[in-house]
Every structure is written in C-alpha cells, then in structure tokens.
C-alpha cells in the first residue's frame, strides 16, 4: 500500500536546496542524542526481538525478516502457536503520517482569456497520509493470516490485504499455500517501500502503462486476488513462488472479465560472500490475459461481462547486493509488452481507462503494433546505524516499440530520481517512530495535454512516520 497517495502534481521547487540543507542539518543535530534501537510493534511484542533483527529500516525487511515472512510469520519454534501468547497480546499495528510537503507540476491546462494555456501549479502545506491497520500472525502453528484494512487521507477504507496461508504443508518448507488478496512475491517490495512522495512512493516499473494503453491488469505493484504456492529451503537461500490470479487488478466483486486469469512466477537464489554478506539474484514473470470486449446496457459496459481476452507480459531480474553491514544496492529490471489491442485503447472500459470496445467485426488499423518497453530500477541504501538510513533511487523506463507506426519513439518515457533519509530516535516493542525527509523529481516525455511536450514534476516532503 502507498502510505501517501495523490495525483502527480509536482515540479521542481524553487527552494528545495535550502529546505533539504536545513533538514540534513537538523538530522545530524538529533543524531548526536540518539538511543539504541529496539523492537517494532505486533510481531516484536510477540517474540521480544529487536526490530533491527527483521528490518534494515522499518518497514523494509532484511534477510532474517524475509525468512520470518516466508515461514508464515513464524520463528519455527514451539512458541509460534497462539496458545503460548499472553492473553493481553493483540497482534495489531496502526500506521499513519502527519506531513508537510511542497508539490509542483508544470504544463497544467488552465483557462485564460484567449482559451486554454499550460501553466505551472505549485502548492504546499500540512497534510495527512492514509491509515494502515495491520493485523497478522498465526491462527495455529503453520496456519498464518494477514488482514490490512487501509484508507486514504479522507478515511475511505478498502481491504489492501486479506489472506490465509497453510505453512509447511506435509512438514516441508517447500510447500506453502496462500489464498486471498496479497502482495505478489516481489523481492523488492513496494508495500515495504521506504519512500512516501506521490511519484517516489511507488516503483514506476511496477505500474507503467504506455501512453493511450487500456491495460490496467499487469501492475505487479498492486495486491492481487488469487492463490499462491510458495516454497523455500530451510535456510531460505533458495525460493520459488507461483500464483494464479484473477485479471482484475485486485478489485473485488468480479467487475471485469467473465473468465480471465494471470500468473505470476518468481524464483531466486542467495549465496554467501563472506564479510560482504548474503547476495541474492532472482527473476520474475507475470503473464496473463484480460478482456477487450464488453456487453453494454444503454452504451455503458456491464461489469463481469468482459470477453475477447488479449495477452500481456512483464518479466525481469532482481538483484540484492550487500557490501558489508552498512551499504546495499537493490536492482530490478523489466521488459514489458501488451497486445496491440491494449495499445490501441481497448481494455478496462469499466473504469474509463480504455475508450474503445472490441465489438464483433472490429479490426485494428494496419499501423497498430504491440507496445513494448524496458526499464531499470537502482536503489542504494546506506545504513549509518539501526536508527538512521540514507536512501536514493533512480528509475528509467524506455519504450522499445510504440503502439502505432509514426509515433515519436520516446513518447511516454519516464525518468525519476528520489533521495531521502529516515531517522528513528527510538524503536520499542510498543511503537515505532521515524522522522522522514524526501525529495523526488519525475520526468515524462511528450505527455503534456496541449503542447505534447515533456512534463517535469517534483515534491519535497517531511513528516513523522509512526506506528503503534
């Protein structure tokens, strides 16, 4: 889930340098009075572990935290069953942020005396994030659950995660079965992302759609509805997962296809490099089909009636590289492609993302092509201490084939840069608190409404990220 959600209303602020300089100076003043780190809520309260045992910086997991998650939120000892818990233990964590941010976006369409023009819009002020309400753990040993009601800043709730998992089926770590709505098995988890701005608070690779494309169903950053089989070696060095998903982008109520499914597959191998740490390499692939043809009533599409399935795919590699105790780099690559039907604007007609209905007899124009793209994400972290982490991210996505012959080859290309840090003055088994500071710059080619020129957006954000 994105802790902060909004439209991409950003552009480079004029006083960003001075704001960031003041923030960094204050960070080092506070650092001089730092305390030792302790534990995080919910699971920390259950097992009495330091939170740094599972997290590089909460909510991002380290190697041990990933193993704990893969084991179904268990340490694989006789205390995993709820019967060993204190009757007063309540496995719940709330998370929310009060923030200040400055957002600016150029080339927005506004009315003027002579018609419409493009103009920069900039705003700043105090705000709130959404609210996450986490609860999870074990119903019995080797039967795990996780429920996450989540809201936006106006307290409009939905279920981000609802899942139950059978762990260690037949006594083997190689067979675990999960059913419900859950995050896909992304090693670089967007749900545990450290950044919070509108464009920096998501991984663009996980949600990219070419300009004019009608396919919302290939977003690997969205929690999906389905069933997953996952397994791992006892030490978690070798991992695999395979999921069968409804092609509905995690939406409930069967709103889209009458019979459309997707699959997500991932595997990885970790290896020890001595003092450098445990490195991991892996791959992932999402392949599926989604509807382009809809029954209508009075011209409006009927939910659940979608047929005329067309294909899409996303595949790539993941690397997690550690260089001692203080520095690591996460890398993700992706090649994506959609059917030419999606590229022409067919697909999600229910939500208005697509504009065309593939009715019987429809033929694509001769200039139509299957859109394809390549992208890379590089995210380094410097962990000064368990209480202070500096981070950066560079993402770029480049179209390798546009949906139509004659379109400019770089239309819709994205480049984004994010830098920030998080300082935790304390972390206990009852609560967590982080002073969060971040700057994001986002650039997309040729997508302004009137002039079809480039859009540059930016956001600077500071706030108190806390859970309890």
What are these regions (language model features)?
Residues 1-16:
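N-terminal secretory signal peptides that target proteins for export/translocation
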Residues 77-96:
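Short Fe-S-cluster ligation motifs
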């Amino acid at each position: 889930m994105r802790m902060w959600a909004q439209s991409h209303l950003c552009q480079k602020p004029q006083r960003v340098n001075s704001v960031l300089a003041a923030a960094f100076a204050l960070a080092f003043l506070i650092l001089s009075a730092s305390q030792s780190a302790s534990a995080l809520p919910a699971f920390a309260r259950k097992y009495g572990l330091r939170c740094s045992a599972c997290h590089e910086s909460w909510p991002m997991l380290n190697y041990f935290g990933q193993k704990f998650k893969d084991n179904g939120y268990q340490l694989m000892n006789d205390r995993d069953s709820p019967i060993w818990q204190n009757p007063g233990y309540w496995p719940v964590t709330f998370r929310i942020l009060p923030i200040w941010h400055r957002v600016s976006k150029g080339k927005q369409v506004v009315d003027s005396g002579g018609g419409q023009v493009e103009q920069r819009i900039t705003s700043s002020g105090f705000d709130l994030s959404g609210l996450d309400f986490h609860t999870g753990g074990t119903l019995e040993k080797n039967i795990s659950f996780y429920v996450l009601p989540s809201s936006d800043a106006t307290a409009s709730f939905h279920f981000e995660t609802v899942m139950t998992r059978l762990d260690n089926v037949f006594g083997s770590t190689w067979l675990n079965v999960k059913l419900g709505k859950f995050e896909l098995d992304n090693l670089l988890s967007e749900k545990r992302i450290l950044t919070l701005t509108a464009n920096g608070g998501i991984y663009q690779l996980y949600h990219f759609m070419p300009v004019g494309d009608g396919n919302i169903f290939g977003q690997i950053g969205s929690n999906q509805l389905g069933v997953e089989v996952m397994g791992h070696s006892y030490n978690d060095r070798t991992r695999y997962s395979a999921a069968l998903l409804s092609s509905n982008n995690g939406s409930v109520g069967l709103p889209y296809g009458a019979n459309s499914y997707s699959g997500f597959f991932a595997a990885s191998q970790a290896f020890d490099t001595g003092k450098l740490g445990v490195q991991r390499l892996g791959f992932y692939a999402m392949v599926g089909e989604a509807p382009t043809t809809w029954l209508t009533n009075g011209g409006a599409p009927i939910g659940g009636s979608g047929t005329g399935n067309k294909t899409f795919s996303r595949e790539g590699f993941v690397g997690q590289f550690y260089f001692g105790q203080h520095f690591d780099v996460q890398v993700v690559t992706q090649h994506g492609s959609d059917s030419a039907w999606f590229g022409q604007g067919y697909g999600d007609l229910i939500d208005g993302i697509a504009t065309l209905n593939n009715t019987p007899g429809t033929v694509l124009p001769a200039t139509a092509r299957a859109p394809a793209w390549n992208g890379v994400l590089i995210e380094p972290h410097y962990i000064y201490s368990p209480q202070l982490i500096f981070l950066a991210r560079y993402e770029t996505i480049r179209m390798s084939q546009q949906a139509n012959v004659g379109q400019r080859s770089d239309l819709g290309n994205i480049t984004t840069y994010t830098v920030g840090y998080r300082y935790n003055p304390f972390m206990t088994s009852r609560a967590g608190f982080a002073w969060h500071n971040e700057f994001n710059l986002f650039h997309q080619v040729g997508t302004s409404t009137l002039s079809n020129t480039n859009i540059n957006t930016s956001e600077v954000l500071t706030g108190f990220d806390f859970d309890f």
